[in-house]
């Protein structure tokens, strides 16, 4: 679980997302409150429930990106789902309970990797011994008798000599034949939508029936060492303890990000039941409020899982959500539409910004690209103008604009090896102004 303070979380998010300070503060406080709750005594801890968040803002302003970056910072079980993928219980489609099952699967994987990392040193020692056993086979009992008679320490000294060479990497390219656990042959079972849990259980059963077999493989020592370390680390892991820790991590620190929640709002002009909108909202209620979900790893309580929902709400409004669900999303944060200045910052400020990506890509062909300040300003203004005149898709417009701008350079890059190209305002105008001025053309191309 992350021990970062709210200001540290916001600073980390600032490296990747421009603006949206209120949304960053809200998720930072929510993440820190997870840690604060765990510091309380057990009696009070059970009374403190997470305050779920609803992020409202137009598409392309950073809602999903905040979720992606938060997942890396949280160091806790995290899953992002699309609200539109679910249907009401009893109808064809995924049920909302699968959110918790997928979250638990993610937690088990996370805890297993952490446990394997803790046991890495012991796993490396075991892997080293297995490789040495192949290079210098251990003497049989009969051979030991002969060695003792000769009063020789040759086997141990030879083994130590090879161990030193192995650790120094001198044997990396040598090929050996080694026995590794064979990957069980998976049985593909096509099941109706909504029955994924049964399918997983059947596949696990068939894998267990196959048993653990070993397969002899020939490979270089460097590659064999990696595979053996993974295999030995997996042997040192206690699967039952992993499941227990994973379920506890989900129940106490789990975070669920539900994107596109506005798409399951029922608008006033629509009549009749809708199994993929209001029905899904009703099914989400017990999860958000707190219930127990059965997973293949055990029963999981959702009382203390943090839910963050987001939506553009361009057609619907938050008030179109059913009242019970509105009440379970008490913290509302509105994200602002992007300005031309924001577009400029998006092009230059974040780590691995779009301009940096194109510079690095063209450098692989030996072409040096530079973006001037007035060129970046013109790109930002163009993106903002197209958003205003057609459909506002936020920062995603920059991908389209830059791809068109760089099309000629990308196509002829191999012929321009060693050249330097400066992308200034004049270059941008000559390549984009005609497209922008033709509204019909820009609507379909940009």
Swiss-Prot record:
Cellular component, GO, one term: HslUV protease complex
InterPro entries: AAA+_ATPase, ATP-dep_Clp_protease_ClpX, ATPase_AAA_core, Clp_ATPase_C, HslU, P-loop_NTPase
Coiled coil: none
CDD domains in the cross-refs: RecA-like_HslU
Compartmental location: Cytoplasm
Keywords: ATP-binding, Chaperone, Cytoplasm, Nucleotide-binding, Stress response
UniProt key word Chaperone: yes
Keyword Transferase: no
Residues involved in ATP binding: 18, 60-65, 259, 324, 396
One family name in Pfam for this protein: AAA
GO molecular function terms noted in the UniProt entry: ATP binding; ATP hydrolysis activity; peptidase activity; proteasome-activating activity
Gene Ontology BP, a term: protein unfolding
Family as reported in the entry's similarity comment: Belongs to the ClpX chaperone family. HslU subfamily.
Free-text function comment from the UniProt entry: ATPase subunit of a proteasome-like degradation complex; this subunit has chaperone activity. The binding of ATP and its subsequent hydrolysis by HslU are essential for unfolding of protein substrates subsequently hydrolyzed by HslV. HslU recognizes the N-terminal part of its protein substrates and unfolds these before they are guided to HslV for hydrolysis.
Assembly, per entry: A double ring-shaped homohexamer of HslV is capped on each side by a ring-shaped HslU homohexamer. The assembly of the HslU/HslV complex is dependent on binding of ATP.
Designated name of the protein: ATP-dependent protease ATPase subunit HslU
Gene name of the encoded protein: hslU
